[in-house]
Structures are given as C-alpha cells and as structure tokens.
C-alpha cells in the first residue's frame, strides 16, 4: 500500500472526478461553514481512487461537495464518527438488499445523512426511522404506522420500503441524483425545477446541477452532502478516521401472543430489556399489539426458549 500523503483538496477534485457514488437527506439545511478546516487533506490518491473506481454512481466533487467534506472533517467530525460506528449495525443488511436489486451500494449513505443510522431518529416534521419516512409515505409503501407498531422504526422493513421508493423515483427521472432530490423534496418539486430551468426530462446525473438553483434550499445541499459522506465513509482511514464499527444485530423471529411485554421476553431469556427494545424499536409501547400476535425479534438461537416458555404460561 502506498504511503498516505497530503494533497490540496483542489488536487483531490481532479483525482476523484472519474469515481462513482450516490445520494439523499431529510435534516434541515445546515450552514455550510468551513472555519477551522485546513486546505490540506490526508488522502492516499492511488489507493483510494482504485478502491472507489468500481462503484456505480457518478461522483462529482465540486465546490458544494467540498464544503461538506470540510464540514465532516471539521466541526461535524465527532458526529460523523458516530455515524460510522452505527453503520456497523445496519450497513451490511442495507448493502445486501441494494446488491439484490442491482442498485448502487452508495445509496446506503442516504440512511447515514437522513438519520445517522438511528431507527429512533425523529425530525421536527415528524419523519421517523433510519430512512426518515413521513407517515403517509410510509403507509403508501406498505409500512404499518399505528399506535402500537411503527415500522418506520424497523430498519429491515423500512429499508425495503425506502428502496422501493428510490427505485420508483429512479424509474421516473432516470437519474439517481434526481431520485435523491425527489426523495428529499418530493417528485413534484423536482418536476417543477425541471420546468423552471428549461431542462427537458431526466436521464443524466448532470441535470441535478443544472436545476439546483430551482430546488428548495435543503435539497440544494442534499446530493452534495451525500456525495461527501460517501466519499469519506467508503475509505474513512484515508481521511484519518479510526473507528470500530458496531457489530450487527443477529436475531431470530418468534410469533408472540397479543399484549406481551418485551420485558417478559427479556426475563425468559435472561437478557436486558434494553436489548429487546433495540431489536424491536418498532414496538413503540414496548409490547405486542393487543389485537394480534406479532413477530418479535430475539437474539439468534433463542427462539425455541421463548416458544417453550410462552406455551407453558402464555398469560403470566
């Protein structure tokens, strides 16, 4: 491996232009301040370029993307490190599903900039979960959202719904950048921006940059933020990040009777109630719904113990 060397970010732009990556965010637009970040970035050019050449989304590193790179390396560095740690919980699962669909794997970082990979994240606009679905959109893509179960907070179910949505948007616009923008702002606003800018149709990633000034303010930062996150997260050690990613949750599922508290399952298994909550963040009242049995996630290899205990005493 070549020895990392420091190069100006402008040089990084030239090196990175042929690379590939992808898009999205739901947090409020943030100030693009870069105070305190030096112009020199540690970046092993040959190694990082080779590593990223196989990705599928076109990577454009321009001034807007550079600002987010500097921000993640500067004042938001600690937060970005936390995101990298939490990626270990769900990143493998999301990548597997992206591969199965033939979608760009870097769409994984949509979840990073949406929620920091937190299934309990909630926005001021009441979006929720790893993928920050609003309630109506979640229901439209098959997720249950009621007073007992909120599948926006289920990383597995919500990932399937989010990828369905992104595939639909990509089919409509022919561009992952525009699909990302539409995920953030809505397809209607992207269509409006296309009309106002006089651009005819989609199908080209460069169109996002052509219509960017006609998009809502938050959406103007959306794709640049994702591209910066993907660039750093794909090769974090090249940018000086030394993190140990969390281990993924390994679980079985077991059908549990109505109104069963998660704490009871925890007692049966002699595990902490917090572990059961972490495995089942979508059970928002800490128990199965009163009107139906429900599939509950339990630590891998423990499902038979739960089944046996509940069979002996289903109403304890």
Residue ranges and their predicted role:
Residues 68-85, 117-124, 132-174, 199-214, ...:
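Substrate-binding clefts and substrate-entry loops adjacent to catalytic sites
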Residues 64-68, 82, 86-89, 93, ...:
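Extracytoplasmic/secreted proteins, especially bacterial periplasmic and envelope-associated proteins
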Residues 103-119, 179-186, 276-279:
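Short, functionally critical alpha-helical segments immediately adjacent to catalytic or ligand/cofactor-binding
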Residues 89, 93, 102-108, 112, ...:
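Extracytoplasmic
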Residues 34-73, 122-124, 132, 136-137, ...:
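Catalytic and substrate-binding regions of cell-wall glycan-acting enzymes that process beta-1,4-linked
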Residues 2-3, 11, 17-102, 107:
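An acidic, Gly/Ser/Thr/Pro-rich helix-cap/linker signature
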Residues 262-287, 293-299:
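Beta-strand-rich binding/interaction modules
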Residues 244-273:
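Primarily a LysM-type cell-wall glycan-binding module
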């Amino acid at each position: 491996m070549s020895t990392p060397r420091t190069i100006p970010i402008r040089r990084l732009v030239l090196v990175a232009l042929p690379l590939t990556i992808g898009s999205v965010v739901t947090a409020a637009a943030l100030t693009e301040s870069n105070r305190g970040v030096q112009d020199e970035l540690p970046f092993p050019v040959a190694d990082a370029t080779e590593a990223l050449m196989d990705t599928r989304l076109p990577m454009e590193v321009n001034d807007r993307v550079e600002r987010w790179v500097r921000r993640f390396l500067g004042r938001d560095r600690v937060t970005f490190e936390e995101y990298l740690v939490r990626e270990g919980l769900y990143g493998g699962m999301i990548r597997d599903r992206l591969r199965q669909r033939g979608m760009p794997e870097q769409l994984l970082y949509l979840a990073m900039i949406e929620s920091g990979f937190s299934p309990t994240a909630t926005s001021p606009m009441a979006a929720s979960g790893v993928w920050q679905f609003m309630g109506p959109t979640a229901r439209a893509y098959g997720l249950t959202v009621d007073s007992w179960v909120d599948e926006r907070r289920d990383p597995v179910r919500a990932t399937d719904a989010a990828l369905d949505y992104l595939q639909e948007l990509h089919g409509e616009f022919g561009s992952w950048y525009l699909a990302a923008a539409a995920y953030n702002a809505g397809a209607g606003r992207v269509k409006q921006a296309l009309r106002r800018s006089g651009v005819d149709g989609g199908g080209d990633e460069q169109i996002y940059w052509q219509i960017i000034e006609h998009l809502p303010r938050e959406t103007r930062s959306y794709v640049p933020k994702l591209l910066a996150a993907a660039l750093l997260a794909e090769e974090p050690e090249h940018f000086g990040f030394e993190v140990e990613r969390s281990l993924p949750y390994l679980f079985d599922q077991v059908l549990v009777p109505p109104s069963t508290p998660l704490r009871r399952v925890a007692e049966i298994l002699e595990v902490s109630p917090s572990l059961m909550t972490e495995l089942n963040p979508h059970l928002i009242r800490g128990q199965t719904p009163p009107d139906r049995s429900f599939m509950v996630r339990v630590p891998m290899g423990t499902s038979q113990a739960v089944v046996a205990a509940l069979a002996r005493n289903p109403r304890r």
